[in-house]
Amino acid sequence: MSEGAAVRRLLYVEDNEDNLYMLQLWFDVLGQYEILSARDGAAGIAIAAAERPDLILMDLNLPEIDGWEATRRLKADPATCDIPIIALSAHAMAGDREKALATGCDDFDSKPIEFDRLLAKIEQALAT
């Protein structure tokens, strides 16, 4: 990112502390992104509405409100419907990518996270 370019804000909705910590480390090294976090779908919805991040990374298997339902609610809300969402799943099954896209996600990636691949997806989503 060029000098003086704005830092992009990402919301990572993830209940696994290790996954959150690792992603935070990766993005800290880049210095291009500020990471907001939520531990469940309900908190993710609230933080997205209040903070208006540039992009949301949404784990699909969350407590309380899962990532599928959180995505539906975010896309149905005029205040958050335009925020790109990349779905993440550790238990990716056949058809999950298609289901995530049909739910309103802009992209899908499986865990374990391959940082370069995820970064390319983030940059592509932010460019559109």
Named regions from a protein language model:
Residues 14, 39:
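Conserved acidic carboxylate
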Residues 17-36:
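Two-component/phosphorelay signaling modules centered on CheY-like receiver
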Residues 59, 89:
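Active-site residues of response regulator receiver
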Residues 63, 81, 93, 112:
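The feature encodes the CheY-like receiver
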Residues 112-122:
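C-terminal output helix
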